C-alpha cells in the first residue's frame, strides 16, 4: 500500500517534542550540513536501534538546536508490503523503544518526567497496534500494554472498540 505523509511542523522538531511526541522528520528528504552531522557522530549503527537510527539522529541533532525548516509539500512516498508488515512493525517498535530508553536515561528522574516517559512508551505501543489491526490478537496486546502504561491516552479506547467491532464483522463473514 502507498501512504502519503506530511512531516513537520517545525515546532515539533525540537528535542523535547521529538522525545516525548515522536518523530516528525523524514529521512528520505532531509539535508544536513556535513559538519553538523559529524558533530553528533552521524548515524548510530547499533543493532538494537536498527530501523529507528534516523529518529535517534534527529534527537541528537535537535539537542544542538540547529536551524530547521520544513517544506510544506509531500516530497516522497513509501510502500509497505503486507507480507512483512507485522515483523517490521514489531522490529521498529523494539528499536523505537531502545532509542527512547537511550534518551530517557539522560532525563531527570522527577515524577513528572517518569510519567511523561510512560506516556511516550504508551504512544509507541498504540502506534504499533494501529498498524497491526489486521492481526487483532497482537494489536490487542499492544493496546493493553499502552493502557497499562498510560490509561489516560483516551484515543486508545475507541481504537480498541473499532478493532473488536471489525474483528467480529470479519468473523461473521467467515
Label for each model-derived stretch:
Residues 68, 74-174:
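C-terminal subregions of glycosyltransferases and related glycan-biosynthesis enzymes
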Residues 2-91:
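Conserved nucleotide-sugar donor-binding catalytic segment
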Amino acid at each position: 500500500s502507498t501512504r502519503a505523509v506530511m512531516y513537520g511542523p517545525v515546532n515539533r522538531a525540537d528535542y523535547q517534542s521529538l522525545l516525548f511526541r515522536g518523530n516528525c522528520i523524514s529521512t528520505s528528504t532531509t539535508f544536513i550540513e556535513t559538519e553538523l552531522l559529524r558533530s553528533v557522530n552521524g548515524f548510530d549503527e547499533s543493532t538494537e536501534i536498527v530501523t529507528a537510527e534516523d529518529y535517534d539522529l534527529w534527537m541528537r541533532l535537535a539537542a544542538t538546536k540547529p536551524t530547521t525548516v520544513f517544506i510544506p509539500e509531500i516530497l516522497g512516498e513509501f510502500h509497505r508490503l503486507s507480507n512483512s508488515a507485522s515483523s517490521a512493525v514489531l522490529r521498529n517498535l523494539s528499536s523505537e523503544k531502545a532509542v527512547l530508553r537511550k534518551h530517557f536515561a539522560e532525563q531527570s528522574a522527577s515524577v513528572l518526567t517518569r510519567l511523561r516517559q510512560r506516556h511516550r512508551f504508551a504512544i509507541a505501543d498504540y502506534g504499533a497496534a494501529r498498524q497491526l489491526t489486521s492481526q487483532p490478537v497482537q494489536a490487542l496486546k499492544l493496546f493493553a500494554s499502552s493502557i497499562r502504561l498510560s490509561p489516560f491516552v483516551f484515543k486508545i479506547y475507541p481504537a480498541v472498540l473499532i478493532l473488536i467491532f471489525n474483528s467480529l464483522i470479519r468473523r461473521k463473514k467467515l
